[in-house]
Regions:
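Helix-turn-helix DNA-binding module
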Residues: 72-87
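N-terminal interaction/assembly modules
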Residues: 1-58, 107-112
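Short amphipathic alpha helix immediately N-terminal
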Residues: 57-76
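DNA major-groove recognition helices of helix-turn-helix
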Residues: 88-106
Length: 112
């Protein structure tokens, strides 16, 4: 699995929920433009975009790219990488802890 594939899986499992929030916020934004919604939705959209950019910059850091697996399908992990379910789970935890470190360091204050 190359770096692009690793990034794809990281984005799917970590970023996807926030992208969904952006889609919902965009719908509110359309209403706001028509005068049917508050400015709060517009501010939320902007903060979500900023948040995703920050997350992506953390995900693209070299130390995360050195880890060779983020495909979390257990059978594939076992067959292609000889990783157990437990090892794959530990990798997931490492990625999430890296993001939590960034949140705690104030780099991602939106989620604090």
């Amino acid at each position: 699995m190359d770096v692009k594939e690793i990034d794809k899986y990281i984005k799917r499992y970590i970023l996807a929920p926030y992208r969904l929030r952006i889609l919902e916020a965009r719908q509110d934004y359309d209403l706001a433009i028509k005068g049917k919604c508050s400015k709060k939705s517009i501010d939320e959209i902007n903060s979500l975009y900023d948040y995703i950019e920050k997350i992506e910059s953390i995900i693209n850091s070299d130390d995360l790219k050195k880890i060779e697996i983020f495909r979390l399908d257990n059978k594939t992990v076992l067959e292609e990488y000889n990783m157990t379910k437990h090892q794959a789970w530990n990798y997931r935890k490492r990625v999430r802890s890296k993001i939590l470190e960034a949140i705690n360091a104030g780099e991602l204050s939106e989620l604090k």
